[in-house]
């Protein structure tokens, strides 16, 4: 089973994944972008830009990472439990300047149509996101601000709705304001 955690920065994806590592010791834990050696280099380029990158070039770099991630991680472990911190869904949401049909086609190509079966979508409100952003050093994407993140979160919801019409997926939407213990319990039940 391929499971992905989706949500904007600071909603607790990493915290919940860490809790699952204690339970699913044989699972494959990964992340996008940056789940491979190539991906780490691309992630560095994308998050710490030293020069401007066009939106189209940025999209193609993320797709290159995704294709490599599929080859190295997803394809070789497709018969195991795979839990990923983000996926192509975030890629579609962050690429807000492009149409969903185009993004879906490009991601389908990069992933050879290998999609997650279950999606855990953690949602945060403006206050929660602002509070958590203020507690960390920001990368170039995080520096775009709270309004940017809320617009991405809105786009994530729209992408999930779009994907329900395209592929067979189960989606669990959770309020990130809940305690990490309560969220963990709901996630465990969803994964059974």
Swiss-Prot record:
SUPFAM superfamilies: P-loop containing nucleoside triphosphate hydrolases. It is an enzyme of class 2 (transferase). Belongs to the thymidylate kinase family. Keywords: ATP-binding, Kinase, Nucleotide biosynthesis, Nucleotide-binding, Transferase. InterPro entries: P-loop_NTPase, Thymidylate_kin-like_dom, Thymidylate_kinase. This is Thymidylate kinase. GO terms for molecular function: ATP binding; dTMP kinase activity. ATP binds at residues 7-14. It holds the Pfam family Thymidylate_kin. It comes from Campylobacter jejuni subsp. jejuni serotype O:6 (strain 81116 / NCTC 11828). PANTHER family: THYMIDYLATE KINASE, UMP-CMP KINASE 2, MITOCHONDRIAL. It catalyses: dTMP + ATP = dTDP + ADP. One of its GO terms (cellular component) is cytosol. It comes from the Bacteria. Gene3D superfamilies: P-loop containing nucleotide triphosphate hydrolases. Phosphorylation of dTMP to form dTDP in both de novo and salvage pathways of dTTP synthesis.
């Amino acid at each position: 089973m391929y499971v992905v955690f989706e949500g904007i920065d600071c909603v607790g994806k990493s915290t919940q994944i860490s809790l699952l590592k204690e339970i699913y010791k044989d699972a494959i834990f990964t992340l996008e972008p940056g789940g491979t050696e190539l991906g780490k280099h691309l992630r560095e380029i994308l998050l710490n830009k030293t020069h401007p990158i066009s939106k189209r070039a940025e999209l193609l770099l993320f797709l290159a990472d995704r294709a490599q991630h599929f080859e190295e991680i997803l394809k070789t472990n497709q018969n195991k439990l795979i839990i990923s911190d983000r996926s192509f869904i975030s890629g579609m949401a962050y690429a807000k300047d492009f149409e969903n049909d185009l993004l879906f086609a490009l991601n389908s190509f990069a992933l050879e149509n290998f999609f997650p079966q279950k999606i855990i979508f953690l949602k945060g409100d403006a206050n929660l996101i602002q509070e958590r952003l203020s507690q960390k050093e920001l990368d170039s994407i995080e520096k775009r601000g709270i309004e940017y993140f809320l617009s991405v979160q809105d786009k994530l919801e729209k992408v999930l709705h779009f994907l329900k019409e395209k592929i067979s997926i189960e989606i669990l939407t959770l309020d990130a304001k809940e305690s990490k213990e309560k969220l963990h319990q709901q996630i465990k039940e969803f994964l059974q």
